[in-house]
Amino acid sequence: MSETVWAVDGSFFAQRLSGIQRYSIELLAALDRIVPPGFVEIVTPPGVETPHYTNIKVVSFGTHRGGVWQQLDYPRYLRQHGAGGLATCNVIPLFGFRGIAVVHDVCYRARPDFYTDPRGRLSAAWHCLQYRRIAKRAERIITVSEFSKSEIAKYYGVPASKMDVVYNAWQQMQRIAPDESIFARHPQLKPGQYYFNMANLLKNKNFPWVLRAAGAKPDAVFAIAGGGSLAAEAERLGLADLPNVLYLGYVSDGAAKALMAHCKAFLFPTLYEGFGIPPLEAAACGAPQIIVSDTPCMR
């Protein structure tokens, strides 16, 4: 039997980087600085690239990928090695899991009105099943804010004594060099004269508010970064013909840092978050103003 005590679900390394994946990466980097060799392993599907660690060993295991790997191969590894699991991305194996799980938020349970189309309802059903399973099976739950901790207790009856808060961080922004070339590529953006928002089509991100704000301030430039069909969504909302809105598409971390540093204000009109990393990152980058919604998670 292996001497490994904890085996981390490393399947997130194969996913596109977002707040949850960023949290997981930074958490493991911090763990690597304090754990003894052999105490923690990261288990990944085959062919997944990971950072280099000093004290944490990375193990490629199994034959599947994605959700199937999480549900079949990962718990098989835990059983074979007698290790506790550490799952950092809201999902655990439905069977065969013993250990610690990170729940970033319970948005699917708290705001079902955000998930009304067939795909959204299916996703909500899966995540709510996961929330219930984590509440029942995890030995401890980590979450990212006192607000999220209170929501887990409210909806799933998890006692506070079973939960710990490990906050999101901003320090990763210090390691990113700002990419000032974004301004040469978009000469409409003058430092200190534009509002900046990092958007997506998730309803909690409240993208329509940004467009309405742009419509109310026709003399101001609104720079919107983010992948997906943001322009198509603006057209669906009847807000596509706003000449002061500039869609930047997906931007690199370096470009985002430069845009945050030189904006007039960073906009984060969220309707629900477990933590909400972007305002903290914007503050770390020197954004002179940060405008957030008046919702409990932002207070």
Where are these regions (language model features)?
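Carbohydrate transferase catalytic cores enriched for Leloir-type hexosyltransferases
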Residues: 1-299
